[in-house]
UniProtKB/Swiss-Prot annotation:
<keyword id="KW-0686">Riboflavin biosynthesis</keyword>
<dbReference type="InterPro" id="IPR036467">
    <property type="entry name" value="LS/RS_sf"/>
</dbReference>
<dbReference type="GO" id="GO:0009349">
    <property type="term" value="C:riboflavin synthase complex"/>
</dbReference>
<dbReference type="InterPro" id="IPR034964">
    <property type="entry name" value="LS"/>
</dbReference>
<dbReference type="GO" id="GO:0009231">
    <property type="term" value="P:riboflavin biosynthetic process"/>
</dbReference>
<dbReference type="GO" id="GO:0000906">
    <property type="term" value="F:6,7-dimethyl-8-ribityllumazine synthase activity"/>
</dbReference>
<comment type="subunit">
    <text>Forms an icosahedral capsid composed of 60 subunits, arranged as a dodecamer of pentamers.</text>
</comment>
<dbReference type="GO" id="GO:0005829">
    <property type="term" value="C:cytosol"/>
</dbReference>
<dbReference type="Pfam" id="PF00885">
    <property type="entry name" value="DMRL_synthase"/>
</dbReference>
<feature type="binding site">
    <location>
        <begin position="80"/>
        <end position="82"/>
    </location>
    <ligand>
        <name>5-amino-6-(D-ribitylamino)uracil</name>
    </ligand>
</feature>
<feature type="binding site">
    <location>
        <position position="127"/>
    </location>
    <ligand>
        <name>(2S)-2-hydroxy-3-oxobutyl phosphate</name>
    </ligand>
</feature>
<comment type="function">
    <text>Catalyzes the formation of 6,7-dimethyl-8-ribityllumazine by condensation of 5-amino-6-(D-ribitylamino)uracil with 3,4-dihydroxy-2-butanone 4-phosphate. This is the penultimate step in the biosynthesis of riboflavin.</text>
</comment>
<protein>
    <recommendedName>
        <fullName>6,7-dimethyl-8-ribityllumazine synthase</fullName>
        <ecNumber>2.5.1.78</ecNumber>
    </recommendedName>
</protein>
<feature type="binding site">
    <location>
        <position position="113"/>
    </location>
    <ligand>
        <name>5-amino-6-(D-ribitylamino)uracil</name>
    </ligand>
</feature>
<feature type="binding site">
    <location>
        <begin position="85"/>
        <end position="86"/>
    </location>
    <ligand>
        <name>(2S)-2-hydroxy-3-oxobutyl phosphate</name>
    </ligand>
</feature>
<comment type="pathway">
    <text>Cofactor biosynthesis; riboflavin biosynthesis; riboflavin from 2-hydroxy-3-oxobutyl phosphate and 5-amino-6-(D-ribitylamino)uracil: step 1/2.</text>
</comment>
<keyword id="KW-0808">Transferase</keyword>
């Protein structure tokens, strides 16, 4: 029986980061975590391309264009949506996650979900590098591993 399993080697991988700028005081830490993770796992900053968009809602359409370009082995979506007093959070977060999932399925390029969807600023801070780790790092590891699995299939 053959078992296909990915590894965490980023050497030679071309990774696109699509970054929602809204809540940049949080997102900047996610981006740093993503870049550090790629480099720590043998990747090169020369093989990383950052594409900045206004916010989380715009991430899926840009990720779709990036995936269709054929330039990337993996795409990492990074952003932060923090709940406020209106239903706006639900619409933005829901459409973002749905759109990112569709891009991955339709393109065959792994698109890792590193968009924080949290109730409070404290929760966002925790997930951007303090108590709960850095979700930018975690989703980048998932993107690296998935890209390596797909290369074997």
């Amino acid at each position: 029986m053959k078992i296909i399993e990915g590894n965490l080697t980023a050497q030679g991988l071309k990774v696109g980061l699509v970054i929602g700028r809204f809540n940049s005081f949080i997102v900047d830490s996610l981006v740093k975590g993503a870049i550090d993770t790629i480099v720590r796992h043998g990747g090169s900053e020369d093989n990383i391309e950052q594409v900045l968009v206004p916010g989380a809602f715009e991430i899926p359409i840009v990720a779709q264009k990036m995936a269709a370009s054929g330039k990337y082995d993996a795409i990492v979506a990074l952003g932060a949506v923090i709940r406020g007093g209106t239903p706006h959070f639900d619409y933005v977060a829901g459409e973002c996650v749905k759109g990112i999932g569709q891009v991955a399925l339709n393109s065959g390029v792994p698109v890792s979900f590193g968009v924080l969807t949290v109730d409070t600023i404290d929760q966002a801070i925790e997930r951007a590098g303090t108590k709960a780790g850095n979700k930018g790092e975690e989703c980048t590891l998932a993107a690296i591993e998935t890209a390596n699995v797909l290369k074997q299939i």
